[in-house]
């Protein structure tokens, strides 16, 4: 089997390559079909997924069985001021990959986000794959357009929405909170935006379980359990052992101090219903996955040996 991983330098791409290389994750083994897979990892500048001709030629030349698209413009605030760049990476890129995958018969795994939802229809119920999206930010809008292109142009697709991703590698909320706690000793974090923290280990594991099947469609894949950013930050500080206080604030209070920030959904909790009903949901409770992260994290070096 031949697999192409786009955007391999990011959090998820790095973790997927690690699991393919080692044949397993913290959760369990990867599918047997992937143990001797040929893996082609590509990122900018070698492949710009927003360039149709470049994508078409690259996919036709390599003829993969599976394409896992981890490439995206994920800076939520940056998307508000760089609309064209966000559209090219988050919408045109997936369109180009979908068309190339359809031509060559490849399966396409496309990673999306909880930010396709408005978060306004609360009720305390996690949103499953049947919930109608309604993005309130440029990031969410461009990611939703990418989903639609994948659905339209490639019938062998897996669209996998995730949320609040962190990993041993790259920049993420966990590392930001740890570093800010060390630097300032006191943090204010919003307590009225709720979702599902997701360890990249869990997401990569589930993607690799899915990609060898024919269970095509839309999936949610996030850490089990729901919390606010304040709850998440408090648990990060507790597990890290950093001597810092975490205080709650509202979204409105945060926005007043950071008027340039994009609107974010107040309720974007996802339900992994499709995973449970198809290949099985091995995703850990967010607290357990976070504790495991701190047990293995080696600071700037990534993961402990």
Give the positions of each predicted feature.
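Glycine-rich Rossmann NAD(P)(H)-binding loop
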Residues: 189-194, 219-226, 278
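NAD(P)-dependent short-chain dehydrogenase/reductase
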Residues: 148-195, 200-202, 208
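NAD(P)H-binding glycine-rich loop region in Rossmannoid oxidoreductase-like domains
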Residues: 49-89, 100
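Catalytic helix-loop patch of NAD(P)-dependent Rossmann-fold dehydrogenases
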Residues: 88, 92-96, 103, 107, ...
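Mid/C-terminal beta-alpha module of Rossmann-like enzyme folds, strongest
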Residues: 15, 206, 213-260, 301-303
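N-terminal Rossmann NAD(P)H-binding glycine-rich loop of SDR-like oxidoreductase domains
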Residues: 1-26
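Amphipathic terminal alpha-helices
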Residues: 285-305
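Rossmann-fold cofactor-recognition segment
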Residues: 38-53
């Amino acid at each position: 089997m031949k697999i192409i991983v786009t955007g391999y330098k990011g959090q998820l791409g790095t973790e997927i390559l690690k699991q393919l290389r080692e044949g397993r994750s913290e959760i369990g083994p990867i599918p047997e079909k992937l143990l001797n897979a040929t893996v082609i990892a590509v990122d900018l500048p070698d492949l710009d997924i927003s360039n149709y001709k470049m994508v078409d030629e690259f996919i036709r030349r390599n003829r993969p069985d599976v394409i896992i698209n981890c490439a995206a413009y994920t800076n939520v605030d940056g998307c508000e001021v760089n609309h064209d760049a966000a559209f090219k990476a988050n919408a045109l890129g997936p369109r180009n990959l979908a068309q190339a995958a359809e031509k060559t018969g490849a399966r396409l795994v496309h990673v999306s986000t909880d930010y396709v939802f408005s978060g306004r229809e609360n009720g305390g119920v996690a949103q499953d794959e049947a919930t109608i999206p309604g993005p309130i930010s440029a990031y969410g809008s461009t990611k939703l357009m990418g989903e639609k292109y994948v659905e339209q142009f490639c019938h062998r697709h897996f669209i996998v929405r995730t949320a609040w991703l962190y990993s041993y590698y790259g920049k993420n909320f966990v590392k930001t909170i740890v570093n800010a706690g060390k630097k300032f000793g006191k943090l204010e974090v919003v307590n009225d935006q709720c979702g599902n923290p997701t360890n990249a280990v869990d997401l990569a594991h589930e993607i690799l379980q899915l990609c060898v099947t024919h269970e095509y469609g839309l999936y949610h894949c996030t850490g089990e359990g729901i919390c606010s950013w304040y709850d998440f930050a408090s648990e990060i500080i507790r597990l890290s052992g950093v001597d810092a206080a975490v205080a709650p604030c509202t979204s409105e209070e945060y926005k007043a101090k950071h008027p340039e920030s994009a609107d974010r959904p107040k309720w974007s909790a996802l339900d992994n219903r499709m995973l449970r009903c198809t290949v099985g949901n091995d995703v850990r409770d967010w607290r357990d996955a976070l504790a495991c992260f701190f047990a293995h994290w080696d600071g700037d070096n990534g993961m402990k040996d």
